[in-house]
């Protein structure tokens, strides 16, 4: 007689894997998802040094450069990875492929000057994972696992309120960050006796939930007196421990912190009297995660470099961007996700809006990521 058993019982009775989740080499965007701003097209090289609505989270010090109110929004794809599972159930072999995934709003922000500086409010998606696994005919001792399917989703959203102040050559900023972490793990399988080809049991599990936590972000931005075309910036976001996530804490229970160092350099008049080029480099060090969770996190360094050439033609400024991003594995079961990036912006003269279209092509294969960002000067043209 077929039995439908809960996860823990079926794993024990039939001697299956002791973990509800087993990841293959999944491209790692759990912490390092680019929210899709202007900087995405330049390898993520300008988040620490740029001044826009993203600064509330990435570096609140640069809010101090904003002298008129602005609104920003970004849309991008959220990649999905799918893996075909072969071999035995307790020693699985994964053959993976990445897909474009769904489209979503990944940033909404507002910045406005106040008496002594600038306040920024933002929603930003900073991490994403959606991995699906499927296989059948997986040997497991004297039994066989058929119709195996498992899906794991992780999404980290940050809600931030920050303040930045322009103090001459050096800006300072700080903010409060609320993290909302969504986790889902769903799995189904059938246990079969290969001698009789009869189903002897099934296992179904569906665990999901949200956890929230409170953290902080601080930043500093410096422009040397003797080199006004250079900016050096640093920001630090604390690790965030999650609360209210009893059902999913074994899967993921702490959002790693991030220390960021960024440099940007401007040069003028390369190919035209008004044109200028901006070069950038950024290093993001993720730290303070937990290695003993189902989605493990270790300390790791993500690097980005790129350039933006600003062309003045047809009554508009056209930023053209190229870059590279190197994102190594952030934990066991994950793979690097490096990318070549490019993008185009549009800044019409005497208008309040700006548009940015950016792309990132993973070097390991898969569809090209795409983002659309729009900025609107609420308080007038800067």
Where are these regions (language model features)?
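Gram-negative bacterial Sec-dependent N-terminal signal peptides
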Residues: 2-22
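Short, intrinsically disordered low-complexity segments
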Residues: 2-3, 15, 75, 81, ...
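Residue-level micro-sites within transmembrane alpha helices that shape
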Residues: 2-3, 58, 307
